[in-house]
A protein has these predicted regions:
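Hydrophobic faces of well-ordered beta-strands that scaffold small-molecule active sites
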Residues: 8-14, 31-33, 61-65, 97-99
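Active-site-adjacent beta->alpha loops and helix N-cap segments on the catalytic face
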Residues: 17-25, 37-60, 76-81, 101-109
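Residue-level signal for inorganic ion chemistry
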Residues: 89
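N-terminal amphipathic alpha-helix/helix-capping segment at the start of soluble metabolic enzymes
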Residues: 1-13, 17, 21, 53-54
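A short acidic, helix-capping loop that chelates divalent metal ions and anchors anionic groups
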Residues: 69-74
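Short helix-capping segments at alpha-helix termini
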Residues: 1-5, 31, 56-59, 93
Length: 109
């Protein structure tokens, strides 16, 4: 982990493996890898995830888990997809995943 002032961790949102490497070079403590930035961030490809994991050696890798843009209210099928993506991230050795789910009323689910 890189040392930063006041014990803050420096996280960068990256939309490619190249961006992950630039963040590491710039001293980021953690990278949040995502795709679909115009949609608010979606789950990146498996290839991007495993390549970023292989190449990042001083920066933690977190992966956004989000099957689509739009709201954060997911169907049962979308929840199954998210669970499979989380399993794949675990197998790839990522340091963490990032996700959010809401009820139709807008409460945290």
């Amino acid at each position: 982990m890189n040392e930063t002032s006041n014990n803050f961790e420096f996280e960068i949102c990256a939309n490619s493996v190249e961006s992950c490497l630039a963040a590491q070079e710039g001293g980021a403590d953690r990278v949040e890898l995502c795709a679909g930035i115009p949609e608010g961030g979606t789950t990146p490809s498996h290839g991007d995830i495993v390549t970023a994991r292989r190449l990042l050696n001083t920066t933690k890798l977190h992966v956004i888990i989000r099957p689509r843009g739009g709201d954060f209210t997911y169907s049962d099928l979308e929840m199954d997809i998210m669970a499979a993506d989380i399993d794949a991230c675990r197998e790839a050795g990522v340091d963490g995943v990032v996700f959010g789910c809401l009820t139709p009323e807008g409460d945290i689910d």
